[in-house]
Amino acid sequence: MKLQKLIIENIASIEKACIDFEHGPLGEDSIFLICGPTGAGKSTLLDAVCLALYNTTPRLKQAANERYLDENDSFSGTGEVSIDASRMLMRRDSVSAQVELWFTDAAGDALRAVWSVARARNKAGGKIQKVVWTLSLQDGTPLTNKSTETRTEIERRIGLTFEQFCRTTLLAQGEFTKFLK
């Protein structure tokens, strides 16, 4: 798998960003370092890649049993939202969030994974809607329509589950000691 382009809108601390892995400085080298001060958005970049590919992130998995009260939540029926719900990465006071990842799979097919979520009626106080997560060819031809299909198809095309991807591709914050063991 090779990343080509990452487009982020309203994910955690990032309002808008487009990272081109094929042109400019990132296109010239096969390896690069993500660095910056605390809070600069380094982990958010990795979260965005994981959201597009797997509809979850390492830091959400770490908070699997934590919940908070959100009177605008429409899914649980209790107003409680799990901290591990991927839609919780929507930037505060935004009405929608999206990640678009352009990449080539193990077979060399050019693909585009899109993860998005929005609030009802495009209002900041609107209820958070269901995540929409799709996979298509880069020419726009859809390959999946449902989240379960998207997960299965991405895992098949990349050849890695979320856990395998995390172990082989990135090291989440707080996981370095575990990695050394």
Q: What positions do the PLM features span?
A:
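Extreme N-terminal "head/tail" segments of very large remodeling/mechanoenzyme assemblies
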Residues: 1-170, 174-177
